[in-house]
């Protein structure tokens, strides 16, 4: 049966329509004609993939195809890893504690948003933490482990990522592009009126940045300033000649949503003029689907090694049990990403997983 779906995205400066997406369903498999648009196959993902893990991050090992999962622990007190070679097995996998918060000083509270990266033949975990004496003095820190298995060996503390302005900062993510490694993070600026903006700089080591710092985005759009003025939780996906950066905005309740930045892959990423920003969120709450406050995502690929997946957290109810931070039920979920004829990701926010 031929299905024609017209998907209009009021983004890319609010001036374009992504166009018609054509797909054929045959024996339950989704295919595409003439390579007009990239479609994901119908995947048997058992959502949620992990319960009570906000800020989910997945690293897929290229040699084995197995998944390493990490996310924010509900008590904000430790960092855990779990691994499985099937996405649906992550919820059953043993969760191994590989690091615990300090009992005094820094790295002693609000252990948030750990990300697992592998480069320089070393595993790195980037995370945010507050001090025991001042839990809201949030800064960014790095752990390292040279063991082939990140669940084994010793995780060493490399220290804090220092930024030119010493202020509330979190959600560090790193990526390499054209021989350069970059860091994107969220940070507060006392001279501004927002809670956090997204900044970027080149890195000269796994724990330090160099050169100028550029502001990729500040929370200025209406959807980004609901409850709090926030841009945070960046994730990078390089596809189809573009560098895409998703991010999250607003308060961490049902108003939380995802936006999109992009730049041409051949452009100078440190030039702000080369970056573009969606005018509307690309993924947001949908009460009819029972999805509330989706965001702080990462990307991986399905077990076929080809299909891009969006990994994100959300709640399945509106009324919180306490505050957005004390309510533990932000569950990790996965869904395929579609690609339009212009090489942009289509998230189908109005459709379920």
Model-based region annotation:
Residues 34-353:
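Carbohydrate-active catalytic/glycan-binding domains of CAZyme proteins
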Residues 18-28:
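Bacterial N-terminal signal peptides
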Residues 1-11:
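N-terminal secretory signal peptides that target proteins for export/translocation
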